[in-house]
């Protein structure tokens, strides 16, 4: 096995794949009652606590942990992919392990961080970027229509599967600023 272009190509391929994995996980595990644990944790609890409008933002510091996945989800998702990565690496006779793992880890980190920033605004520099504001509006629309806009990081799968609906109204800056003030007060009081 040689290092060359295979690692960066694997990174790009697995990052794009991350969009499809996120979409599938979100649609078929987190929004389907037959999978009780993910359905309860996400569709019932998360969507019950974080709705639309001002309720899209954190309103009770005791539920801050309901924004993120459980600690064991990241290692589980990575381990789940290891057999496929090793199989592809062996089949292609190319070194893709580093690129594939880097893409999956970065995608997961971005999902967690972006999702956290969306529901717990603090006026971070990231929250002021066009890219974040577009993704935030995209996700806000998901909280209005639960079976659309299933991607948080990269909505390629939403486009591909026809579940993308454009945000008709963007979360206006005053709403995010008010949300950031509300979160700041809540967290400082706890």
Feature annotation, model-predicted:
Residues 1-12, 92-102:
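Hydrophobic alpha-helical transmembrane segments
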Residues 182-190:
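A membrane-cytosol interface segment of integral membrane proteins
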Residues 18-101, 105-179:
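Membrane-embedded catalytic scaffold of the fatty acid hydroxylase/desaturase
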